[in-house]
């Protein structure tokens, strides 16, 4: 949810802007955090100690965030299912000779694929086009030591594959769990918020029902009743019903089910923008129902956690360290220029833009779908499996970071739904995140969506529009002209193509991880998996991709032997 950014295996222009408006002005340059030189290509990652960022403009780091205990997730059906799938990789027969699998893209999908292939005894060779890990969870450090990210990343209790991954890496303590609530701004009451509080003493779905019934500020009782009646088929029909709604937009489904339009105004607009960065007139209802289904089925499903620091170091580097400890490789600055084919149409190699040729026993594309389509060989474009990808297009999104000269009071140690026409969700990261903590200054991180009309606008325009919206959320503390709280600095990160746009009738176009091209596989949240275009979906897609490769390992090994024999004859 609310994850943005992308990894690039082609010459896309990645737009990252930073404007100077005070003596704390930041650099536009991307800053490396733990890179080691490589004789073979690009940069090879090496382990690096985690250092707190230098902060000259206020007192040393001192954490006072009040977090909540990690919820009991291990006994949920989905967590057990995810743990079992992990165990199959560790228990799989050790190969006589590990397969070399070349993977394009070091976002969560590529990292997940590589991690579980390494668990199965194979050798992943991970190639990332940029000089930073993470893809849609990438982040950069400015010259002041402050981090700015591609998105505001939230980890839900209903993310069993992500939660398993944290446990397997031994980093559960890096998630800062917040109060089990959802907090919405009240547009008609500037500066005020409305809460949905989930009681710990009740099981699901009663805790969610109680939270909705107890909130009398956003929906009236008649609206709640009609909303509940509209959701009954989803509760009773389960996953088959949810999948059958793929062809309807949120608004079309509401009309069909007799749900009042105010439910969209009060709830679904905020959910749609948080889940997929678009409004409910465009979003497939399946997307909303998948989220609601998970939240209602699992007691802690809607409970949220923040990562305790920047994602490249706090999440991605532990995965890289794990992969390397099992013999895998991770290379940065290794952009794919071309997928070279054999005479039979299978992959011969990946040609990098630095001239290097990468060969393997199998190949994975774990980039965004837009990058895959750009590099798709002409010989493959007539295959229905690849033709269906045309419907899948990344959605634009903008992530905004603003450092203020004071500590804002009208905020919470939590994710907040702005219910603004321009903004989606936001958080005061100086409160919610340990690494970004500041006792004297707030740093608001905000998702600017929908962004289609703004992606080409200047950073100054985006900041001015953001400040106008913030003046409504903080009427006593922020004004658009900065006559109240003043901006010390800001960063604007634009992503022209983020997660795929989940419009109606996309589901049949999502590809399974095993392609019809022998030895070629896909990973990414756009591929077929039961979760949303999200961090959870990316991790699960990588796991399913690794599973397909392990299942095909004997075939792939035989292909490799034939290739070697042919090469020796020549």
Swiss-Prot record:
Keywords: Carotenoid biosynthesis, Chloroplast, Chromoplast, FAD, Flavoprotein, Membrane, NAD, Oxidoreductase, Plastid, Transit peptide
EC class (word): oxidoreductase
Entry's Gene Ontology molecular function annotations: FAD binding; phytoene dehydrogenase activity
Pathway info: Carotenoid biosynthesis; lycopene biosynthesis
Entry keyword annotation includes NAD: yes
Chief subcellular location: plastid
Membrane topology type: Peripheral membrane protein
Any one cellular-component term (Gene Ontology): chloroplast
Family the entry assigns: Belongs to the carotenoid/retinoid oxidoreductase family.
Protein name, UniProt field: 15-cis-phytoene desaturase, chloroplastic/chromoplastic
């Amino acid at each position: 949810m609310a994850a943005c950014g992308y990894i690039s295996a082609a010459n896309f222009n990645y737009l990252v802007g930073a404007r100077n408006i005070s003596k704390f002005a930041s650099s536009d340059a991307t800053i490396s955090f733990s890179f080691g030189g490589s004789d073979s290509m690009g940069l090879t990652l090496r382990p690096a100690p985690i250092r707190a960022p230098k902060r000259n403009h206020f007192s040393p780091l001192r954490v006072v965030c009040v977090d909540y205990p990690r919820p009991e997730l291990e006994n949920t059906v989905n967590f057990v299912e995810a743990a079992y799938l992990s165990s199959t990789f560790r228990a799989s027969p050790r190969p006589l000779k590990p397969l070399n699998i070349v993977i394009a893209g070091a976002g969560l999908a590529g990292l997940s694929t590589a991690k579980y292939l390494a668990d199965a005894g194979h050798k992943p060779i991970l190639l990332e086009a940029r000089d930073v890990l993470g893809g849609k969870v990438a982040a950069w450090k400015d010259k002041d030591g402050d981090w700015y990210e591609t998105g505001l990343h939230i980890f839900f209790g209903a993310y069993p594959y992500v939660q398993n991954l944290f446990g397997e890496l031994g980093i559960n303590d890096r998630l800062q769990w917040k109060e089990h609530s959802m907090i919405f701004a009240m547009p008609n009451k500037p500066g005020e918020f409305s809460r949905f509080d989930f009681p710990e003493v009740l099981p699901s779905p009663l805790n969610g029902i109680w939270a909705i019934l107890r909130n009398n500020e956003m929906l009236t009782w008649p609206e709640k009743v009609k909303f509940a009646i509209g959701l009954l088929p989803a509760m009773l029909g389960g996953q088959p019903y949810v999948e059958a709604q793929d062809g309807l937009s949120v608004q079309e489904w509401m009309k069909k089910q007799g749900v009042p339009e105010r439910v969209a105004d009060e709830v679904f607009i905020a959910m749609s923008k948080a889940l997929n960065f678009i409004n409910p007139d465009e979003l497939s209802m399946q997307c909303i129902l998948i989220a609601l289904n998970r939240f209602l089925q699992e007691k802690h499903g809607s409970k949220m956690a923040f990562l305790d620091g920047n994602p490249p170091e706090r999440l991605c580097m532990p995965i890289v360290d794990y992969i390397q400890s099992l013999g895998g490789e991770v290379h940065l600055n290794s952009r794919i220029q071309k997928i070279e084919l054999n005479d039979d149409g299978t992959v011969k190699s990946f040609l990098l833009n630095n001239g290097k040729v990468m060969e393997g026993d199998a190949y994975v594309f774990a980039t965004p779908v837009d990058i895959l389509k750009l590099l798709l060989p002409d010989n493959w474009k007539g295959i229905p499996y690849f033709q269906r990808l045309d419907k899948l297009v990344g959605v634009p999104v903008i992530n905004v970071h603003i450092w203020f000269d004071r500590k804002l009071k009208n905020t919470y140690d939590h994710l907040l739904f702005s219910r603004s026409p321009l903004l989606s969700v936001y958080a005061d990261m100086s409160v919610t995140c340990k690494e970004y903590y500041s006792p004297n200054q707030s740093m608001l991180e905000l998702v600017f969506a929908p962004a289609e009309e703004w992606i080409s606008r200047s950073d100054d325009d985006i900041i001015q529009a953001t400040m106008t919206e913030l003046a409504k959320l903080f009427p006593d503390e922020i004004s658009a002209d900065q006559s109240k709280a003043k901006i010390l600095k800001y960063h604007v990160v634009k992503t022209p193509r983020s997660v795929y746009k989940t419009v109606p009738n996309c589901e049949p176009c999502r590809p399974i991880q095993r392609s019809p091209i022998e030895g070629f596989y896909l990973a990414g949240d756009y591929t077929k998996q039961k979760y949303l275009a999200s961090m959870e979906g990316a991790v699960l897609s990588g796991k399913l991709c690794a599973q397909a490769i392990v299942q095909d390992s004997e075939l792939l090994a035989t292909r490799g032997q034939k290739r070697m024999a042919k090469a020796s004859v020549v």
